[in-house]
Amino acid sequence: MADIEEQPLPRTFEEFNEQRKAAFIRVKDYKQAGNRLIGFLCSYTPLEIIDAAGAASVALCGTSDEVIPEAEKVLPANLCPLIKSTYGFAYSQKCPFTYFSDMIIGETTCDGKKKMYELLNELKRTHILHLPQGRDRAYEREGWYEECRLLKEELEGFYGITITDDDLRAAVRRRNRLRAAQLEMFALQANQPAAMSGVDLMNTMFAGTFSFDIEAYTQQLEQKVAKLREAYDAGERPVAADAKRILITGCPVGGVINKIGRTIESNGGVVVCMDDCSGERTAAMMIDPEALDILRAIADRYLDINCSVMTPNDGRMENTLAMCEKYHVDGVVESVLQACHTFNVESARMQEAVEGAGIPYMKIETDYSNGDMGQIETRIAAFIETL
């Protein structure tokens, strides 16, 4: 493994704006202090195994259209913007987390990502987890357990360490505490009116994926929850009482927080629940740190995440309806990134389930550009007006 001091800054470093330069220096300093860094992209990545290896896990940059022209020098244009953006940031050396990571952990969720990871491996060492397409058959669950075991072995060999069960249990306890704090923050939105702007909530959760220190980020969340709860109890109401309560479901919202989330909230709505990779459906499941086979407990927890890449995927619709009830939802907006075939096809079942429960539903198919902003604002404003 190369020493970080032997690695120069990106060739285009002097062209970066000050914010990006500062981010690169922060990550470079972190690595030069002897710390380990692993990049990942998907919520199926078993982070406790990375934690137990003494490495920080950070999400790869992949939520901007800035680098998509670079990506399209290699990738086809008619591909999901998240995939193109992730590869474009690596290809152009504009993401500090990709650039300075020791390794990237990929996964075979969708066809586009798993083939992109093969190309990414030419730029940065990439270990790919083979995620099964379902979880109802015994061999699928057993196969995923084997993938988690292989990841553990990969990290042990790469870093020259041994990951013990005690290491895994300690990592589980830290992640459980983080998820408990996330769930407390989500729960504040069940208040009527909601305790905070949904855009603020989404940005808070998104920022956590770039944090090197789990415990520090957890403490920040706990403190923010306490302050929000105290302010709400004191009578502060940052959200209008008549704001229409919207649940966002579908693809990862990181690249469309402003495009969809802010548009909802500037047209008389408030995002009270995120039913995506960074939302409650991913944070809700805890792991028993006292499980006899702690690695299997970790593997089972991640395989139970509901995502459209799984078939069948009835649990996703059931969970969405449960969240609609919990958060007193007035309407559901499904965000589908262009060329995301699994969420796009599954949206028909989601619409049927949501409207069958008497809740209005709207699907928005979009990308990371601003070309359709006018159309999206018109559609969202009209949708909220009907609620």
What are these model-predicted stretches?
Residues 2-36, 149, 153-271, 275-286:
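A charged, amphipathic alpha-helical module
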